[in-house]
Amino acid sequence: MPTVEQNLFLWGKADGWKDDGDKWSEKWGGTELEWSTSIFPRIRQFIPVPTILEIAPGYGRWTQFLKGFCEQLIAVDVSPACVERCKERFAADPHVRCYVNDGKSLAMVEDRSIDFAFSFDSLVHVEADIIAAYLDQLGRKLKPGAFAFLHHSNLGAYSNSIWLPKAIGRQQPIGANGGPQMSRSLWLRRRMLSKLTDWGLVNTFDNRAESMSAKVLREACDAAGLECRAQELVNWNHGRSLIDCFSVVTPAGGQSRRPPRLLENPHLMDEAERARRTAELYHSARSRD
């Protein structure tokens, strides 16, 4: 289960951000293709707006596009190295302001000042307690009628699967010591997976948060005075399992809340592959090589 400290250690080192994080868009054929193919079509209904809040921008992979859709962009990250790089990268853009936080605070953001909040490919590493803290603050920071688009883990929906990460695999069986209730055979299979992970034979979902799911986010929204309007469950690098979720939330109005619209999409990686192959086709048509 990634903690704030673990995430700071994992993502706070400059040598892990070669090419400003563009390596994580390779499946799409590049960052610009990922933005134009898989991100912008999903958020175009919500921008442009006066003020955008980006949570966990890293080295500004999406900030470079978002900044063209607002009069003011506030970027908040737990990593001082990431914030320093964003300040350097967007020094010529005075409407972009960058802040270091403690991994869960939005105290530097004025209440009722945000028209659109955004986070992509970062909060998947954040556990349920931190997501709940962010949502509680977004309930105050978002203007009435504003929206947030949040990319988070849905790994918690697979809590009964043997393919959960090694941290759960090391829990004691039958709920001992506060661990999850599970059969001894399931626990033993989890232990085997843990060993395979230690030996480098299994990739445990890229440090996805184990306690987060689409359902957990909806419950946290209710507690924060927010309404979850839509959720898209997607695969990410690991077959067809819907281990990630894109959620759209907004401050709850006076009327009764409706259940969010749900879409199960096991084809996000196919979307990425098509974008990459199409771009390669037309790039090769232009080149003689």
Go through the PLM ranges and name each one.
Residues 1-49, 59-107, 126-130, 147-289:
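Class I (Rossmann-like) S-adenosyl-L-methionine-dependent methyltransferase catalytic domain
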Residues 56:
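Conserved S-adenosyl-L-methionine
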Residues 118:
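A conserved beta-strand element that flanks and buttresses the S-adenosyl-L-methionine
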Residues 121-122:
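Short catalytic micro-motifs in class I SAM-dependent methyltransferases
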Residues 132-144:
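A short glycine-rich, Lys/Arg-flanked "PGG" loop and its adjoining helix->strand segment in the class I
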